[in-house]
Amino acid sequence: MAEAPQPPPPLVEIDPDFEPFSRPRSCTWPLPRPEFNPSSSANSSPAPSLQPEPAAGNVDFLSNLSLLEESEDFDPAEALGVCGDFPCQDIRQLQPPIPQQQQQHSQQQQEALTLLAPSVPSALSPASSPSPLGAQQPRKSSSSRRNAWGNLSYADLISQAIESSPEKRLTLSQIYDWMVKSVPYFKDKGDSNSSAGWKNSIRHNLSLHSKFVRVQNEGTGKSSWWILNPEGGKNGKSPRRRAASMDNNSKFAKSRGRAAKKKASMQSSQDGSSDSPGSQFSKWPGSPSSQSNDDFEAWSTFRPRTSSNASTISGRLSPIMPEQDDLGDADVHNLVYPSSATKLTSTLPSLSEMGNSENMENLLDNLNLLTPNSSTQSSPASMMQQSGYLFTSPNTSLGSPNSEYRKYSYAQTGISPISQMPMQTVPENKSGYRAVGQYPVPAGLLKELLTSDSPPHNDILTPVDPAVSQANNRVLGQNSLIGSNSIMPAYGSQPAPNKMSSHPHLHQPNHPTSINGRPIAHNPGINRLSTVKTSVQVPMPHQPIQMTSMGSYSMNSCNGYGRVGIVSIHQEILPSDLDDMLIESLDCDVESIIRNDLMEDGEADFNFDSILPNQSFPHSVTTTTHSWVSG
């Protein structure tokens, strides 16, 4: 007997491990064993399942639950049929292992009874024993169920919820309520703490499956309706919408459709005429016309070439200022600005940018500067190279007391020993432009100079007689002195034989001085000349001379046509004893300047006798011919 028990202990130790019935808390219920009597478990009639002893009914219930294999309540002889092929007799003959096995099963039985406490008392009574058997029957058949509540998935539950509603539509919160009320598993999981998981699963399934369609709610601030897809949709284990496989990927389907459209468009373009631009560029794969309608939507936001600003057909639509070819003659003025010995022209800013009234535009129609052509570039205007000169624009707003002269200063570099005025960028003030270092002239002066007994504007620009040109050159050749505040009188105001006399209306309260027949006005304030009634346009063929010690006096000449620019120098920058100064001490040898500075390079070759034809002039000015010819 001592050697006999040695082989069975391994069987005793292995047997519980191979028995799945000793795991009552397992999530997967075991299949029914074929050794069980089907009449005691599968029969739905109450008569066969009833046992005369209450203990036998309890044994049937526990055996149907597959929780226990042996118990103290039934005979060991009956256990033979239960054990079947196992050597149960040898196991029962071994007394020590039996109490241990029974103790293990008793503990498992107590755990099972605590789990099934509501159903065990009803199972112990003979009359109510069929009901737990019938209730436990679906559990045995639902061994392959996927969820804790049964075989129904979340999508199936949502479908039932929507179908159960009268309008066949539910909001998300209504679906939650239906789950809590209708499904027993969710009855105790309706609070916010325990419902986060399954509510998230419901939202996931609603957006995942194609059988659910979201409909916008009519009311503002309300959640959308969820309905079943009338066309039918896939549910259950259908492919997800976001799956990136080659079969159901939407991007891949679009790319295949795009390739088909591209192929069709290329074939149609080859069949059509090749003269049209669309048929030519559609053969290029990167062109917009070769893409599908989806890709072409990005091109629809651009304007076509025929309506773009870059097109030459549509005209100027860009905010860029037009060039000078579109401006009128009154807006473009060319100043004789000698950049070299042969190139004398320079373009001033348009006067429409400097003026701010309609009277200015009317005035500019008759006050245009004439541009010298190539045939007259060797005119006396080339003498302007010797010094910096100032162009004073005569346009000012008539009737505007605060308007000022617009002054633009230009200069030549490295030509004249005389102090030159540098090229300056003129800043913009409130009502006009002011050159740096210059002072404004009152607007009333220009108004009175341009009105009353002045000649008409169309007669202002008068060609200069050669005799006057020669006379002026003679005066310059005699080292004439021109004051910075002097005003050049208008020729044609009165006859002055053999000399140029001042205008009869020129009134100067200070000491006027006449040198070589030219009045020099020592004017402490230019505003005292408000009574002067004359035209400021004087035909002067000679160049302006800028005196270094007395400020700026300037005059522009353009091939015999000239305009006087009056520049006011403030009294403070002049010497206090200006009236007592001798003007003769400020000599300027123009001839030496011309000979030494202009003709030393051999490029400035001009003769005053043959420039202008003989023309009549209202003055009987007689003078000797004096000309310079480069040697």
Curated annotation (Swiss-Prot):
* Single Gene Ontology BP annotation: positive regulation of apoptotic process
**Which residue intervals are the DNA-binding region?**
149-243
**Keywords (A to Z) from UniProt:** Cytoplasm, DNA-binding, Nucleus, Phosphoprotein, Transcription, Transcription regulation
- Extent of Polar residues compositional bias: 303-315, 381-403
Q: Which stretches of sequence are listed as region Disordered?
A: 1-57, 90-147, 223-324, 372-404
Annotated tissue distribution = Localized to the animal hemisphere during early cleavage stages. At early tadpole stages, expressed in the branchial arches, pronephros and liver. Within the head, expressed in the forming thyroid gland and in head mesenchyme anterior to the eyes.
Please report the PTM annotation for this entry: Phosphorylated by AKT1; insulin-induced.
- Protein name per the record: Forkhead box protein O1
Indicate the secretion signal residues. none
Which SMART domains does the UniProt record give? FH
The UniProt record lists the keyword DNA repair: no
Would you tell me the Gene Ontology cellular component terms? cytoplasm; cytosol; mitochondrion; nucleus
What is the role of the protein in this entry?
Answer: Transcription factor that regulates metabolic homeostasis in response to oxidative stress. Binds to the consensus sequence 5'-TT[G/A]TTTTG-3' and the related Daf-16 family binding element (DBE) with consensus sequence 5'-TT[G/A]TTTAC-3'. Main regulator of redox balance and osteoblast numbers and controls bone mass. Orchestrates the endocrine function of the skeleton in regulating glucose metabolism.
Positions with biased composition (Basic residues): 253-264
Q: Where is the composition biased (Low complexity)?
A: 37-48, 100-135, 265-282
Classify the source by domain of life: Eukaryota
Composition bias of kind Pro residues appears in: 1-11
**Localization per Swiss-Prot or TrEMBL:** Cytoplasm; Nucleus
Q: Name one Pfam family in it.
A: Forkhead
